[in-house]
């Protein structure tokens, strides 16, 4: 590996695709981003055009090379990280998708999920996959496409169709159809993968009538899956050597390599993931059990709590209530509040995620008086994000018995100093902000680089990690518990109002 070698991370997200080029020290030297179309055919449905996603990825690869000034031949390996659960089915010979990609947020297969519950399959799915039965995951989306595209079931049974999440689709396209693989982390989000036996589950496939021939082979998160075909990568054959779903990539990028290490990504929603080590913890409290990552012949499991609304509640203050000009203004406005924290905002705009999993709940405000100001509402909205994180972290502690010493954070809202300080106060543990908030792409780059010897081992990765600011608890215990008790009352009242 020469001094002039680099690693490229492709970060394929829900609204945009990005490519970032990293050097040996984990610093990005060039990047490019491109948004793509969101399709909403019916209420609750969300779809993407898989070919448009592929075109956007090709565009950002070129853009990253232009910005960095490096040549494709200098790329030692490519890591892919992706929006998870989003489902694509395509023709094996032509490479043409038979339907739009059904996005993780989409509820169009909810009836299939409800049918599985009514048939009494919930416990079986939970034990084998670690997941709750929900249309969030890929399994019901596959079944929906096979049911609604004419002839699809028969074609799948004849071995003519392939399924993949976004990682698999991009790998297949980059290798010109040579590689049909996925990784442990993405497989564990399909609701088809047995996380104990590390294989596609025959009983589940039979229940859903999904032919096994459609499914990609599952590999580790750090190995060479194939090489780019020259015409897709400007004349170079570069190994694709790392893959992970976005939240697991962020866990790896945050260096959460030991059991009990926990990270939270504050994005549109908030995703708290804890490394639980080499044995899965099946949650008794509605946390998702998933695979964190598999490297060097070992698989590390994780617990995940998904919060549906985090950063999007700040966007609501800006766009819906017109209380902010810019989302970043929320910190300054919150600090102007003179309230005693008696206002609570429960941002259940699309229901409540973990640990409640209440799709029917809707947002509410409590404690309003004639004296309540917009500053109070902005502050309470930020606090609502932090309270939800405590709900999840407390539940994880109850599930595992593990005391967390620090919460590692990243994502856009982690820049909000007021939110981070309140988060430390309400959790009573330090908050460590990442020095570089691009931890998702960095995790994919790390996985790719380890596989090709760009980095030697985890110890060398740790040397490149630069933590950002640490926020220490400043609140008294009595005050903390008083505030949190008020939040629990607000959530209970919200759930009662339907």
Swiss-Prot record:
Q: Which GO terms describe its cellular component?
A: cytosol
Point out residues bearing the modification Phosphohistidine.
Answer: 232
Q: What is its EC number?
A: 2.7.1.30
- Pathway(s) it belongs to: Polyol metabolism; glycerol degradation via glycerol kinase pathway; sn-glycerol 3-phosphate from glycerol: step 1/1
Task: Detail which positions bind glycerol.
Answer: 84-85, 136, 246-247
Gene Ontology molecular function: any one: ATP binding
Mind telling me how this protein is modified after translation?
The phosphoenolpyruvate-dependent sugar phosphotransferase system (PTS), including enzyme I, and histidine-containing protein (HPr) are required for the phosphorylation, which leads to the activation of the enzyme.
Q: Does the keyword Aminoacyl-tRNA synthetase apply?
A: no
- State the name under which the record lists this protein: Glycerol kinase
Q: What is the taxonomic lineage of the source species?
A: Bacteria, Bacillati, Bacillota, Bacilli, Lactobacillales
């Amino acid at each position: 590996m020469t001094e002039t070698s680099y690693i490229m991370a492709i970060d394929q997200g829900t609204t945009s695709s990005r490519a970032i080029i990293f050097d040996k020290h984990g610093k990005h030297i060039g990047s490019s981003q491109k948004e793509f179309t969101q399709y909403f055919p019916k209420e609750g449905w969300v779809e993407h055009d898989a070919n448009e996603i592929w075109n956007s990825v090709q565009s950002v690869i070129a853009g990253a090379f232009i910005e960095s000034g490096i040549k494709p031949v200098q790329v030692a390996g490519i890591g892919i990280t992706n929006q998870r659960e989003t489902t694509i089915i395509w023709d094996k010979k032509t490479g043409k998708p038979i339907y739009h990609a059904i996005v993780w947020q989409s509820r169009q297969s909810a009836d299939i999920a409800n049918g599985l519950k009514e048939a009494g399959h919930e416990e079986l799915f939970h034990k084998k996959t670690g997941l709750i039965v929900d249309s969030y995951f890929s399994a019901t989306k596959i079944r929906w496409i096979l049911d609604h595209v004419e002839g699809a079931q028969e074609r799948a049974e004849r071995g003519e169709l392939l399924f993949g999440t976004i990682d698999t689709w991009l790998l297949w396209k980059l290798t010109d159809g040579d590689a049909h693989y996925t990784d442990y982390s993405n497989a564990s989000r399909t609701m088809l993968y047995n996380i104990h036996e590390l294989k596609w589950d025959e009983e589940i496939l039979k229940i859903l009538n999904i032919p096994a021939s459609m499914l990609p082979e599952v590999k580790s998160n750090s190995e060479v899956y194939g090489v780019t075909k020259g015409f897709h990568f400007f004349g170079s054959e570069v190994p694709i050597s790392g893959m992970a779903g976005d939240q697991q990539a962020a866990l790896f990028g945050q260096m959460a390599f030991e059991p009990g290490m926990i990270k939270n990504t504050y994005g549109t929603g908030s995703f708290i993931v804890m490394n639980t080590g080499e044995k899965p913890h099946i949650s008794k409290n509605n946390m998702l059990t998933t695979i964190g990552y598999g490297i060097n012949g070992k698989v590390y499991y994780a617990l995940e709590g998904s919060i549906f609304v985090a950063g999007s509640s700040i966007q609501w203050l800006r766009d819906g209530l017109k209380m902010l000009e810019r989302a970043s203004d929320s910190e300054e406005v919150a600090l102007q509040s003179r309230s005693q924290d008696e206002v609570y905002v429960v941002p259940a705009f699309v229901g409540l995620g973990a640990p409640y999993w209440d799709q029917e709940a809707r947002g509410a405000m409590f404690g309003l008086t004639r004296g309540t100001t917009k500053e109070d509402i902005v502050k309470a909205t930020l606090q609502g994000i932090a309270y939800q994180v405590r709900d999840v972290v407390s539940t994880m502690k109850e599930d595992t018995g593990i005391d967390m010493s620090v919460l590692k954070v990243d994502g856009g809202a982690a820049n909000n100093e007021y939110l981070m300080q309140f988060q430390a106060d309400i959790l009573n543990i330090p908050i460590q902000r990442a020095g570089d908030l691009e931890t998702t792409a960095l995790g994919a780059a790390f996985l790719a680089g380890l596989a090709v010897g760009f980095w030697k081992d985890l110890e060398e990765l740790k040397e490149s990690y630069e933590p950002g600011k640490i926020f220490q608890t400043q609140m008294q215990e009595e005050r903390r518990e008083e505030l949190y008790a008020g939040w629990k009352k607000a959530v209970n009242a919200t759930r009662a109002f339907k």
